[in-house]
UniProtKB/Swiss-Prot annotation:
GO terms for cellular component: chloroplast. It is found in: Plastid, Chloroplast. This is DEAD-box ATP-dependent RNA helicase 58, chloroplastic. The keyword Nucleotide-binding applies. SMART domains: DEXDc, HELICc. A motif (DEAD box) lies at residues 190-193. ATP binds at residues 85-92. CDD domains: DEADc, SF2_C_DEAD. Its main location: plastid. One of its GO terms (molecular function) is mRNA binding. Belongs to the DEAD box helicase family. SUPFAM superfamilies: P-loop containing nucleoside triphosphate hydrolases (SSF52540). The keyword Cell wall biogenesis/degradation does not apply. It comes from Oryza sativa subsp. japonica (Rice).
Length: 438
């Protein structure tokens, strides 16, 4: 199921301003394309360079996903677009194909920016972009503050066609006049709701959207699995001049944001019992690979000198877990090299990754069969993104599960998540299922 809305939407203020709606002609064109197109090549219809399409086919991108079928006609026409579809649906490939269709491979200038909220997501986007580019153009990653001085000289000497950057690194380079955005044709903001929801990043993002370049001179693409109050967001995009007035909202699967094949479970236990319950779950489930999500350490806890919960969980599992999976740590306070090492180590083999929510956005670890919420997510959207790390292609047909550990007082919060995201959560009877004495 897919829904399309132009910026005109139901808002009367938008209609009065004379903004163009997403017309019937566009809808019919998309329907015809969906009915007839069998391959990604046919969807792209000659608007993506041949060498990029060939490379995409070589690595397995042959049949388009639903979001690619629905969005590529809009993206490849050069229109501003809000890509709104669940995690693992193919948004990254969709916007990268649009980027490659827009840039001039023979020109030495920055022509496309992809802005990401985390370095890990940036690493993944950069990898896909470089695979597709196949050395036909330069793709530079600005993801680590410690490397920016060296990269500043590189980007001045030979400007890359595409830059993938975190908000902070990008703003730092722009303010140092490391490169010009005069030639920029495409601006992509990935996980846009996450960046707008981050007090550390939102002001810098607004600068990127309005101060450093103008919406009228570029194609703007927003991507996310979750955009709360999306009609309002579309209106704000136009009102604040983040996009042009004919921005198109492509919303795939709006009714069922949670992948339907996932099993959701929960166990009620005290916080003191939580580590042992987690251990018993791991022994019982025997996951192929798993991610254990733990809450960020509070400032109060830091000031008190307490170790982060991630460290506590990792140390506990390394001394008690007897399974074959390697226990690894990933958290925001780790330096770039340590985080990159952890991310590289989990690729292609069995693992238990203990992480904060940094791993919930854009992480592509398809072998993940089990998610464990050691701490309850703050919002339903956070639950959705954590759950989206499992059940991904080509493993989506496997029995994948999300298990949340909660106290009695947190039960109502989990029920609220179920109502909002429309999924059912089965209770695990802790006392009868686990062998240890609680």
């Amino acid at each position: 199921m897919a829904a399309f809305s132009g910026c005109a939407s139901p808002l009367s203020t938008t209609l009065r301003s004379g903004l163009a709606p997403f017309t019937l002609r566009h809808r019919l064109r998309l329907r015809r394309l969906r009915a007839s197109a069998a391959t990604l090549r046919e969807v792209c219809a000659g608007r993506v360079p041949e060498h990029v399409l060939q490379r995409a086919e070589e690595v397995g991108y042959v049949v388009p996903t639903e979001v690619q079928e629905q969005s590529l006609p809009v993206l490849l026409s050069g229109q501003d677009c809000i890509l709104h579809a669940q995690t693992g649906s193919g948004k990254t490939l969709a916007y990268l194909l649009s980027v490659f269709s827009a840039i001039d491979f023979g020109r030495s200038s920055v022509q496309a920016l992809v802005v990401v909220p985390t370095r890990e997501l940036g690493m993944q986007v950069t990898k896909v972009a470089r695979i597709l580019a196949a050395k036909a153009c330069t793709v530079m990653a600005l993801l680590d503050g410690g490397m920016l001085r060296r990269q500043k000289s590189w980007v001045k000497a030979e400007p890359p066609a595409i830059i993938v950057a975190t908000v902070a690194s990008l703003c730092q380079m722009i303010e140092k006049r490391a490169f010009s955005l005069q030639s920029m044709r495409v601006l992509v903001i990935d996980e846009v709701d996450f960046i707008f929801g981050s007090s550390k990043q939102v002001s810098s993002l607004r600068k990127i959207l309005t101060s450093y370049s103008a919406a009228s001179s570029r194609q703007t693409i927003f991507a996310s699995a979750s955009i709360p109050q999306h009609n309002r967001f579309v209106h704000d995009c136009v009102q604040h001049k983040w996009t042009k007035t004919d921005v198109v909202h492509v919303h795939v699967n709006p009714v069922q944001p949670m992948p339907s094949h996932l099993q959701h479970k929960y166990a009620i236990c005290s916080k003191k019992e939580r580590l042992h319950v987690l251990l018993s779950l791991l022994e019982k489930d025997a996951p192929k690979s798993g991610i254990i999500f733990v809450a960020e350490q509070s400032e109060k806890s830091k000031k008190a000198g307490h170790p982060p919960s991630t460290t506590v969980v990792v140390e506990f599992l390394r001394t008690t877990y007897m399974g074959s999976l390697e226990v690894l740590l990933l958290e925001e306070d780790m330096n770039f090299n340590a985080r990159a090492t952890s991310f590289t180590e989990v690729k292609g083999k069995g693992f238990l990754l203990v992480s904060t929510d940094i791993a919930s956005r854009g992480f592509d670890l398809p072998q993940t069969s089990h998610i464990y919420n050691f701490d309850l997510p703050k919002t339903a959207i956070d639950y959705l993104h954590r759950a989206g790390r499992t059940g991904r292609e080509p493993f989506s047909k496997l029995a994948c599960s999300v298990t949340t550990l909660i106290t009695e007082d947190e039960h109502f919060v989990l029920q609220r998540f179920q109502n909002e995201l429309k999924f059912h959560c089965e209770e695990l009877p802790v006392e009868s299922m686990f062998a240890f004495n609680l």
